[in-house]
Amino acid sequence: MILSIESSCDDSSIAITRIKDYKLLFHKKISQELAHSEYGGVVPELASRLHAEALPKILEEAKEFLPQIKAIAVTNEPGLSVTLLEGIMMAKALHLALNVPLIGVNHLIGHVYSLFIEKEAVLPKMVLLVSGGHTMILDVKGYKDIKVLATTLDDSFGESFDKVAKMMGLGYPGGPVIEKLAQKGDANRFDFPIPLKNAKELAFSYSGLKNAVRLALSEMENLSEQDMADIAASFQKAAIAHLLQKTKKACEIYKPSDFAIVGGASANMALRKAFEQECAKRAIPIAFAKLEYCSDNAAMIGRAAVEAFLMNDFTDMDALVAIPRSCFV
């Protein structure tokens, strides 16, 4: 069994995964969304303190598995340095107490393996990763064989939702709030520009779209509930159209036989529907992680760690450090 820990941002989570068949034997997550909502975003120092409180409580619930643990896995990159450290400190303590190896896991690779929780990995795949901090198209051939085909030049898909929600006074996190509000709106009322529409480069950019929403808001007075819904719907439509356009371009270039979308923002139902329709047209199979595993969680870290364990890809204690910004390259 592998005990895995996730604390890269504002979710405290621990999981126990059986190595031989990937079975998830224990999984618990404590979200900090409510604590950060009044600040309009994650406050690193507060997040760190809340992890320090939550992780030991979760570990106490999983203590029956400790005698059977063969390795300790922990997210060590990328993320907020002060929150990553909370998970790393617990992992090192367990490593010393149980005398089992450590596995440092890249959080983004964890998102890829959220597709394969409790099952064998089916690769290669082209994977679109959409989250609060990242927007990437990946060519995934294996745990240690991942190539970045495209990334964002500025804001990520999820980050743009958070920032637009903050502009509109809708609170944090912005993704679910914008999505819910958009269901009541007219997505054609505001003609927000699709970023990089005519650009040849394979890249994403959300800063221009975000600024277009800011301009529209500044030009309106006494916004009604319907105005807010229309802005949310129009913004969401343009944001997804940009993802779709650049992913279609990647498919034309790389011709994948299999496609998947992962990350917290992949829980957006409008996004899922748009990509399901496009993949159906192209006869390309599409996969998503289960909704419960889209956002940050230790189950995906544990599943990725099984791959590392089977490759004897362990991390020395002194080398296990927090790496706030990283990638696969």
Curated annotation (Swiss-Prot):
Q: What's in the GO CC field?
A: cytoplasm
Q: Which InterPro entries match?
A: ATPase_NBD, Gcp-like_dom, KAE1/TsaD, Peptidase_M22_CS, TsaD
Protein known as: tRNA N6-adenosine threonylcarbamoyltransferase
- Does the UniProt entry include the keyword Membrane? no
- Single GO BP term: tRNA threonylcarbamoyladenosine modification
State if Nucleotide-binding is listed as a keyword.
Answer: no
Where does the chain bind substrate? L129, V130, S131, G132, G133, D162, G175, N268
- Residues the record lists as binding Fe cation: H107, H111, D296
Q: Provide the cofactor note recorded for this chain's UniProt entry.
A: Binds 1 Fe(2+) ion per subunit.
Reactions performed catalytically? L-threonylcarbamoyladenylate + adenosine(37) in tRNA = N(6)-L-threonylcarbamoyladenosine(37) in tRNA + AMP + H(+)
Question: What is the stated purpose of this protein?
Answer: Required for the formation of a threonylcarbamoyl group on adenosine at position 37 (t(6)A37) in tRNAs that read codons beginning with adenine. Is involved in the transfer of the threonylcarbamoyl moiety of threonylcarbamoyl-AMP (TC-AMP) to the N6 group of A37, together with TsaE and TsaB. TsaD likely plays a direct catalytic role in this reaction.
Family, per the entry?
Belongs to the KAE1 / TsaD family.
| HAMAP family cross-referenced by the UniProt entry | TsaD
Localization per Swiss-Prot or TrEMBL: Cytoplasm
**Which principal EC class is assigned to this enzyme?**
transferase
**GO MF term list:** iron ion binding; N(6)-L-threonylcarbamoyladenine synthase activity
Question: What are the entry keywords?
Answer: Acyltransferase, Cytoplasm, Iron, Metal-binding, Transferase, tRNA processing
Task: Enumerate the cofactors the protein uses.
Answer: Fe(2+)
Show the Pfam families listed in the entry: TsaD (PF00814)
Query: What Enzyme Commission number(s) apply to this enzyme?
Result: 2.3.1.234
